[in-house]
């Protein structure tokens, strides 16, 4: 069976805000299966935002696990991310899950992978998925050359990615939090 694939998730932190946005397209092979999936959501009583790229069912499993880690560690994003990454890498069932997560709270932004990596991005910017590099390049240019808000940068960069990446569409879900940095 062919794998569900492709998406674009982008996070920007600027001027007291952190924003994560993603498109809504779910593709299987060359077929668009759904155009309005919600790949970005709030967790931990709205204090954390998270986005995923990869298998949808896998991502929901990981969101549930991550939220339970947040509960266990009193909302400590980094500790919860490290604990999820450890489980993801060592648990035989979780190891088969194919997804990447971006997570952010008021203090930190992280990418969590199934290889056990927890990556803190440079320059307050992170992107994952098939259109991630396009969105990241666009957002980097906008961060360096404009005074646009974090939300506007995410909107514009996702639009550029959707113009280039066939696995990314214009049905965006965008979540925003106040940020300390």
Curated annotation (Swiss-Prot):
Q: Keywords on this record?
A: Allosteric enzyme, Cytoplasm, Hydrolase, Metal-binding, Protease, Sodium, Threonine protease
> Which gene underlies this protein?
hslV
**GO molecular function annotations of the record:** metal ion binding; threonine-type endopeptidase activity
Q: Name one Pfam family in it.
A: Proteasome
Q: What's the Enzyme Commission number for this chain?
A: 3.4.25.2
Q: Which InterPro entries match?
A: ATP-dep_Prtase_HsIV_su, Ntn_hydrolases_N, Proteasome_sua/b, Proteasome_suB-type
> Where along this sequence does the record place binding of Na(+)?
162, 165, 168
> The organism sits in which domain of life?
Bacteria
Residues crossing the lipid bilayer are: none
Q: What is this protein called?
A: ATP-dependent protease subunit HslV
What activates or inhibits this protein? Allosterically activated by HslU binding.
State the organism of origin: Coxiella burnetii (strain RSA 493 / Nine Mile phase I)
Please state which protein family the record places this protein in. Belongs to the peptidase T1B family. HslV subfamily.
Principal location: cytoplasm
List, alphabetically, the GO terms of the cellular component aspect: cytoplasm; HslUV protease complex; proteasome core complex
